[in-house]
Amino acid sequence: MTTATLPTRPAREDVTLIALVGLAHSISHFSQLLLAPLFPWLKDAFNVSYAELGLLMTIFFVVSCVVQTLSGFVVDKLGPRPVLFAGLALLGLAAFGFSASQSYWMLALFSVVAGVGNGVFHPVDYTLINRKVHPSRLGHAFSVHGITGSLGWALAPAMLAPLASLYSWRVALMCAGALAFVVLAVLWVYREQLSLDMAAPKKAGAAVNDNEHTLAFLKIPAVWLGIAVVQGVLIVNAFNVGKVRRTALAPA
């Protein structure tokens, strides 16, 4: 299907969709920095080193990487909307879990939960933008998508550190969890804008290639290289968890 044959989509609908996707994406990036601004408080609260706290970030991003790969298949099967809602709910749950944590290992557990929630956003966002936004506005859509992600990064320390200073790090994380669920509620109100028929569009007169299937991407060498790198990181981390637990940063 060419640009000329695509049905015209009202600009207002595209703007609404781009705003909703951008809002969700900002929470994804916001949640990537849930813990980092609170490291000074968490270090004292759990009697751990900055190296151990840094490991929580590694856990989060490794899980996100793996889930992002797998969630693309789920989005293709179920559509982006339910996957997006699940991701936001998991991020909110993880923030509340962090706030209630009583041990380092509880923080590690909820880092996994947050990583799963964070891993769904790019497959969801790119599917919605590519399938629903008119081609003439794709540049604007991806620009807003990137900008809102950066704004989410900026918001996290600006919101969490003052709340931790005024109240406590637990209150700061509870507010972060509430924010995720507020955004989820907004997206639920506008859920029809996020609906998508996952029946694959077919080009008129185009022959179907029986050799192309869902797993055809596994023929690409770069995919296997990426998998090898991720597995290497996982193995290295598995052998170093115990060592990191015993590591304390040397005085400056």
What residue ranges belong to the model's regions?
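Extracytoplasmic gate region of multi-pass secondary transporters
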Residues: 36, 222-252
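Residue-level signature of mid-helix packing/kink "hotspots" within the transmembrane helices
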Residues: 33, 61-69, 153-154
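Paired small-residue
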Residues: 94, 105-113
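Helix-loop-helix hairpin linking two adjacent transmembrane segments in secondary transporters
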Residues: 145-193
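Cytoplasmic helix-loop-helix junction between adjacent transmembrane helices
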Residues: 110-149
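Conserved MFS/SLC helix-loop-helix module at the cytosolic interface between two early adjacent transmembrane helices
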Residues: 66-102
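Juxtamembrane intracellular "pre-TM" segments in multi-pass secondary transporters
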Residues: 2-12, 195-225
